């Protein structure tokens, strides 16, 4: 059903560094096939956090001219935005993250709602369920910055919805939280995205800056 209503395939990849309680993205790639539209978007970040955009086929100039250089600087991509580093026992939820996806500039604000133990789906497990995870549940609010929100179906749902929830679980010895479940109410009922498989590797040192790297490969499923 979800595929019939939103016929699209998204392949997203993000590379970057964990620096304290933030992520410093280095590269983001989005390979999208939606209906008759195919597009490859790449964002490459310099040392000052300024992204350089490459798009094939190119966007129309009118689609991206409103997002200024100042608005793009020190933002995160749509994948690294959901990797939430923490110190000690701090909650990952109390933060607002500025995001630029190559076309739109928007904020995501997370707020702590509670804790919950969940068992995500695992297609490789005999019973179809993975091990239980202790998660922190956050609400999420979407705020369009530039360009002003347009009447696109998905962004309209995001803008009008203050009941979106994300379940974050601790990884990397509790120093970073990753989303394992995402729920958004829609006119057809709740759309649920769950983590099916996760492979993570880390590098203890990247040189003098003493920042650590986390490379994550994940598979998710969406259902209504």
Predicted regions and their residues:
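Acidic, serine/threonine-rich low-complexity disordered tracts
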Residues: 1-46, 93-224
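A charged, solvent-exposed segment within the mature domains of Sec-exported extracytoplasmic proteins
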Residues: 38-105
């Amino acid at each position: 059903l979800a595929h019939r209503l939103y016929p699209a395939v998204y392949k997203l990849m993000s590379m970057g560094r964990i620096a304290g309680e933030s992520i410093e993205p280095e590269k983001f790639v989005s390979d999208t096939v939606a209906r008759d539209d195919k597009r490859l978007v790449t964002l490459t970040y310099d040392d000052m956090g300024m992204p350089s955009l490459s798009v094939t086929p190119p966007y129309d100039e009118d689609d991206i001219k409103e997002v200024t250089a100042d608005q793009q600087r020190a933002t995160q991509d749509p994948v690294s935005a959901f990797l939430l580093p923490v110190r000690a026992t701090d909650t990952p939820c109390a933060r607002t993250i500025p995001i630029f996806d190559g076309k739109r500039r928007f904020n995501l604000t997370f707020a702590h709602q509670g804790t919950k133990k969940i068992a995500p789906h695992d297609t490789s497990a005999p019973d179809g369920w993975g091990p239980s995870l202790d998660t922190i549940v956050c609400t999420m609010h979407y705020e369009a910055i530039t360009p002003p929100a347009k009447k696109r179906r998905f962004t309209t749902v995001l803008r009008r919805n203050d009941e979106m929830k994300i379940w974050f679980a601790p990884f990397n010895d509790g120093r970073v939280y990753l989303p394992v479940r995402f729920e958004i109410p829609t006119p057809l009922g709740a759309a649920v995205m769950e983590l099916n498989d996760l492979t993570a590797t880390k590098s203890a040192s990247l040189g003098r800056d003493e920042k650590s790297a986390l490379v994550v490969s994940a598979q998710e499923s969406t259902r209504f």
